[in-house]
Amino acid sequence: TETPVTGEQGSATPGNVSNATVTAGKPSATSPGVMTIKNTTAVVQKETGVPESYHQDFSHAEITGIIFAVMAGLLLIIFLIAYLIRRMIKKPLPVPKPQDSPDIGTENTADPSELQDTEDPPLTSVEIETPAS
């Protein structure tokens, strides 16, 4: 199984690489540019200790997709907040107002010229119990 790894990409798959042909640069008389690796383990690591094949830059399409997803999420949150605010304006929290409360009926509307009898009627008879002696 031959696994060609080109020198321009600069990436290698971690694991066993056997009989790989690595082409680097232009072949000339002094440097043929072709190097054959047999039965070795090639793991390219950076200073972080993470194999370089795991390190992937985002392509433009992926960045565009991420931005699109973030914007769609923000738009969804904005619409949710706007919907909740609109519902609060349509049906506010029940605060009892004396002019709006339906408990006060309209049958009590009297002429303001008539005097309203707001006091209690006077007591007609007062019985005082005397203790039996």
UniProtKB/Swiss-Prot annotation:
Gene Ontology cellular-component annotations: ankyrin-1 complex; plasma membrane
Which residues are sugar-modified? 1, 6, 11, 13, 19, 21, 23, 30-31, 39, 41, 48
Q: Give the membrane topology.
A: Single-pass type I membrane protein
The UniProt keywords, alphabetically, are:
Glycoprotein, Membrane, Sialic acid, Transmembrane, Transmembrane helix
Q: How does it assemble?
A: Homodimer. Component of the ankyrin-1 complex in the erythrocyte, composed of ANK1, RHCE, RHAG, SLC4A1, EPB42, GYPA, GYPB and AQP1. Interacts with SLC4A1; a GYPA monomer is bound at each end of the SLC4A1 dimer forming a heterotetramer.
The entry's family comment says: Belongs to the glycophorin-A family.
The protein here is known as Glycophorin-A
Species name: Sus scrofa (Pig)
Lineage of the species this protein comes from: Eukaryota, Metazoa, Chordata, Craniata, Vertebrata
